[in-house]
From Swiss-Prot:
Function statement: Bidirectionally degrades single-stranded DNA into large acid-insoluble oligonucleotides, which are then degraded further into small acid-soluble oligonucleotides.
Subcellular location: Cytoplasm
EC number: 3.1.11.6
Assembly: Heterooligomer composed of large and small subunits.
Database matches in Pfam families: Exonuc_VII_L, tRNA_anti_2
Gene: xseA
Alphabetized GO MF terms: exodeoxyribonuclease VII activity; nucleic acid binding
GO terms for cellular component: cytoplasm; exodeoxyribonuclease VII complex
Organism: Bordetella parapertussis (strain 12822 / ATCC BAA-587 / NCTC 13253)
Protein name: Exodeoxyribonuclease 7 large subunit
Catalytic activity: Exonucleolytic cleavage in either 5'- to 3'- or 3'- to 5'-direction to yield nucleoside 5'-phosphates
């Protein structure tokens, strides 16, 4: 790197400088002229002060430079370096004026080689994205009510304890199957991929959690493996990834069906809390009860309307009888009224004609025959109307509940007054009322039977 230094400070135009003035001017020159840069070297003389600041020397085979990293920046590094560690430090060049020593003021640190790892991460991410493995349309929602939940992680990982604790708290009724595999190391990625494939082959879970706790980029590198990513993408079981902390992203997070910021969050996404399920069941039961009650109310209204049409068959019969009597009276009045007078006049005229014409006798006979036919026709009409009235009366009597009771039947009502049509609705010692043709009977239930001869439902009996 070539850095051009331009000294324009008026301080250097003076004839004589104090040591403090010189160090201050050199410090300002260094800070203004050299930008923030990355420096690779080996950690030595590392000290973590009580204040939280880090002091160490960064060296290689030919040179060394003192370095300081203040607490706020050190807290953002995912590891505590040790002497001998190869690291890459992002820093600004500054001067420690009291001693005139130049130093590095670091604001970032990573293990040496992380830059290469990150470049490999970006290359694989771009490749899989171009293949469509990150496409949201190919991702599936985990089952809302899983039969069982699978967990792929190390048996010794703290993440496993967190997941099991969250699942036991939220969904204790859901079985959990663990597919153990190391989460870091040379063969970790291959063994994790094998466990994902095994879970799909066994098909015993509805949701698969792939989890591990936080760590450095090297610790999480198994989850950036291409073979593991492709196995997760090809999984028939929805996969929820929960790798590291919220700020950590791995290739597996992009191909998984759902990404959780932590292992605990992955467990929470995998199941609905038991309390929410119970509340939903109660709500559904209430809706069913209301719907059933509406149907019962509608049926009761239809029954009431039907009963209103048959409230008093005897009254309808009396009305028809009254109408028949009226017709009989009108028929009798007709014979006593103008029609009777016409018949009498006809008889008189017939007698007079009989004396005046020789054929009046035959006319009288024909007239008498016609009168007889008229009488028979009127009698048949009256008989037909009487038969029709008798038929209607018989039909009305058949619909009269009192008529049914008179044939030996009875109506049974429970303590609430509802008619009992199903014996299994009652229980032993229930109070009932029995209506018969003449009166009512109060009774207590002693035994219950069903139409097939078996005893009633034992669950409805009282001990």
């Amino acid at each position: 790197m070539t850095i051009g230094l331009s000294v324009t400070n008026d301080v250097f135009a003076r004839d004589i400088l104090t040591v403090a003035q010189l160090n201050q001017a050199v410090g300002q020159l260094l800070e203004r002229s050299i930008p923030s840069l990355w420096v690779r070297g080996e950690i030595s003389n590392f000290t973590q002060a009580a204040s939280g600041h880090w002091y160490f020397t960064l060296k290689d085979s030919r040179a060394a430079v003192r370095t300081v990293m203040f607490r706020s920046r050190a807290a953002q590094v995912g590891f505590v370096p040790r002497p001998g560690d190869q690291v890459e430090v992002r820093a600004r060049v500054s001067l420690y004026e009291p001693r005139g020593d130049y130093q590095l003021q670091a604001d970032g640190m990573r293990r040496a080689g992380v830059g290469n790892l990150y470049e490999a991460f970006l290359r694989l991410k771009a490749q899989l994205q171009d293949e469509g493995l990150f496409d949201p349309q190919r991702k599936r929602q985990p089952a809302r009510l899983p039969r069982a939940i699978g967990v792929v992680t190390s048996l010794h990982a703290a993440a496993l304890r967190d997941v099991l604790s969250a699942l036991a708290r939220r969904a204790p009724q859901v079985p959990v199957i663990i597919y153990p595999a190391p989460v870091q190391g040379a063969d970790a990625a291959a063994r994790l991929a094998a466990r994902v494939a095994q879970a799909n082959q066994r098909a015993e879970v509805d949701t698969l959690l792939l989890v591990r706790g936080g760590g450095s980029i090297e610790d999480l590198w198994s989850f950036n493996d291409e073979a593991l990513a492709r196995e997760v993408a090809a999984s028939d079981i929805p996969v929820i990834s929960g790798v590291g902390h919220e700020t950590d992203f791995t290739i597996v997070d992009f191909v998984a069906d759902l990404r959780a910021p932590t292992p605990t969050a992955a467990a929470e996404l995998a199941c609905v809390p038991r309390g929410d399920l119970l509340a939903a069941l109660r709500h559904t039961a209430e809706r069913l009860a209301r719907a059933q009650q509406r149907r019962l109310d509608q049926a009761a209204q239809r029954l009431d309307r039907a009963a209103a049409m048959l409230t008093s068959p005897a009254q309808r019969l009396a009305h028809q009888q009254e109408r028949l009597n009226t017709l009989r009276h009108r028929l009798a009045s007709a014979w006593r009224g103008p029609q009777g007078r016409r018949v009498a006049r006809l008889d008189m005229l017939a007698q007079r004609l009989a004396h005046r014409r020789p054929d009046t006798g035959r006319a009288a006979e024909r007239s008498a025959a016609l009168l007889a036919q008229l009488g028979r026709a009127q009698a048949r009409l009256a008989a037909a109307r009487q038969a029709r009235l008798d038929t209607l009366a018989a039909q009305l009597r058949a619909l009269d509940p009192q008529h049914t009771l008179a044939r030996g039947y009875a109506i049974v009502r429970d303590a609430a007054g509802a008619i009992v049509t199903d014996a299994t609705r009652l229980a032993a010692r229930d109070r009932i009322e029995i209506a018969v043709a003449r009166g009512r009977i109060g009774a207590d239930v002693t035994d219950i039977g069903t139409p097939d001869g078996t005893d009633g439902n034992p669950a409805l009996r009282r001990g």
